[in-house]
Amino acid sequence: MSTGKVRADKDTLKAARVRLGLDQGQLAKAAGLTQVTISNFELGKTAPYDATQAAIQAALELRGIVFTNGDLPGFHFDKSKVVIPT
């Protein structure tokens, strides 16, 4: 069953992290993961579990990232969506 929520890929998640000015350690802490998990995911060394990917995406969304699925998958920053400032 689809929830209609956009599921971002590793490249989009990394770009969103960089856009927010977060390093891998900061994102890992925010998502409740390790820096090694973030690094391996971004490098494509491991495919994350759905829960891992969801935790990464949720941590970014709480900081104002809105993931989109138009012509190409992507994201934008929406200041009104910020729950946790970076």
What residue ranges belong to the model's regions?
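A short, Lys/Arg-rich alpha-helix, primarily the initiator
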Residues: M1-V18, T68
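Conserved hydrophobic/aromatic packing and binding residues within compact polymer-binding modules
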Residues: L13, Q24-A28, I38-F41
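Residues within the alpha-helical elements of helix-turn-helix
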Residues: R19, A30
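Short glycine/serine/threonine/alanine-rich loop segments
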Residues: L22, L33, I65
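Recognition helix of helix-turn-helix/homeodomain-like DNA-binding domains
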Residues: G32-P48
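DNA major-groove recognition helix of helix-turn-helix/homeodomain DNA-binding modules
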Residues: A51-N69
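Helix-turn-helix/homeodomain-like alpha-helical modules used for DNA recognition
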Residues: I65-T86
